[in-house]
Each structure stands twice: as structure tokens, then as C-alpha cells.
């Protein structure tokens, strides 16, 4: 079924009605962001050693001399042949923003549990340029809730019990470097990652939208960008 066809006067009236609803949502989003920024932080006392292109690095090293670090927990299991398709969809939105983040004293790094060689080979295949490091041999993924512990009867994901959850799951964690201390300020998972996918938000502006309602699951249509 196509859209209703109306006069420009009717279209303008309906657009203004929608705008009246959009503006409070914008203000609510701003207030939520302010609340997020005001959250307290916890000190990261565990030592993690990541494998990077330039050698072993601590979590503090991943800041790259900046005060803030955003970690994208990219799903790539140690024995996987390829990275997760949906994480790859998200990562397609990351390239090109690094220089802008740097000018706000912020670094963006992807972290996965797979060996570094696999990550870099897959990054080359995808044509990405953002930093990607391996947390293999550390508890980083488990501690930040994206690798489900095998010995836990009911694992937790997104701050709630997730019966049956196994392996790797996606997330974002945010850190602040304060007087040499690494502080954890925020993590989000599942639909909380939606705000980071620009492609979805472009689709949300269109009459057809995401076109996912009739699919077996929402992202059943998603492929790695070299597999469409």
C-alpha cells in the first residue's frame, strides 16, 4: 500500500503536527544524555593486556593520549571464521568519525576476543580503518558483560538475567582517564546500541522505514557489505 496523496496544505499541517511531537522527544533525548553524562563512575582496578598492531597495550594505552575512550564490543569469537554480520553493519558506520572524536578528546576502539591476526585480516577485507584490538587471554569481555560465562546457570546481559545466552554478545563501554586512573562511566547493550547505527536512522526517515516487521527476526536481511 502506497502513501496517502494529499495537497501541500494538508501535508504541511500534518508535518507540523508531527514536528510538535518531535521537539519534546529531542528535549527528552537531550535530558537523557545529560543524565548519562552525570552518572557516577567506577575505577577499573583489573589489569587487562590487549594485543594491538603495535604490541601489548593496557586499557589506559587504548585511550591514545585522549581523556575518553569508547569501546565497541565487536562479536568475533575465537574460533569464528568471520566477524558477526550485525556488528559488521554497525562498524560500517564507524569509519571517518575518528578525527571528529579526537577533536573532542575521545578515542574509539573495537575490542574482540578473537586473535588479533583474524581481526586485522577481517578489517582489511571490510576496508575499515578504525583501531581493533584483541582481548584474548583476558577477562575483559566477561567483566563487561559481552562474553557469557559457560559456568553460570543464568548469565546476565544488559543488566538482567538472560537464560540460554551463550558465547559473544554486542555492547558499548565508555571510559574516562582521570589523573591516571581508568574509570568506567557507561555501558549499553542490545537496543541501546541503536543510536550508533546511522544507516538505521536514515531508514527511519523514509516512508518504508526499516522494513523488518515481516522478517523472522529484525536483522534477518543484514549481510556483510561484500555479501549482498
Could you tell me what each predicted segment is?
Residues 102-119:
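Catalytic nucleophile loop
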Residues 112, 134-136:
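Short loop/edge segments at beta-strand edges and connector loops
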Residues 1-104, 121-127, 131, 138-228:
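Non-globular targeting/processing and membrane-anchoring segments
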